[in-house]
Regions:
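An acidic, low-aromatic, low-complexity terminal/linker signal
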Residues: 1-139
């Protein structure tokens, strides 16, 4: 696709996934999540971080199925809704890593929410498009 870019690599069970680094604002330890009544798919509650109410959006069921291991951290990422943007807390199962790689185009058999692939030494990592994933979950 283009020159190397920065990505945040995160574990979800046995696999790794990535988000473009410019979308990620922080990695946080699991805080006290507040459960609130709602009907939004995969939203499991909210966190209050630095005075901001942040929805917790557990994407593990979409990526690895219902048997994903316990989440250890929250990856706080920016997600767009039309012209608006908000923070979203994504529970992940382990330590995250910042890396520079060239993203290649996804192959035909990847899910629609995969915007590209990163070739690592022992794994091909899917780069997730949060907006496409949200649209897929909502439908």
């Amino acid at each position: 696709m283009s020159a190397a870019s920065s990505f945040v690599l995160f574990p979800m069970g046995e696999k790794h996934y990535a988000l473009p680094a410019h979308r990620v604002t922080e990695l946080a330890r699991v805080d006290q999540q507040q459960v609130i009544p709602h009907t939004t798919p995969f939203v499991t509650g909210v966190l209050v971080r630095r005075g901001e109410v942040i929805p917790v959006w557990d994407i593990a069921p979409s990526l690895v199925g219902p048997d994903a291991p316990a989440r250890k951290f929250y990856l706080i990422a920016r997600r767009r809704f039309g012209s608006a943007e908000e923070s979203t807390a994504i529970p992940v199962t382990g330590d995250c890593e910042l890396l520079n790689r060239q993203m290649t185009a996804p192959v035909a058999k990847t899910a629609p929410y995969v915007e590209g692939l990163l070739a690592l030494e022992n794994e091909v990592v899917e780069v997730i498009n949060l907006e496409t994933l949200a649209a897929e979950v909502a439908s």
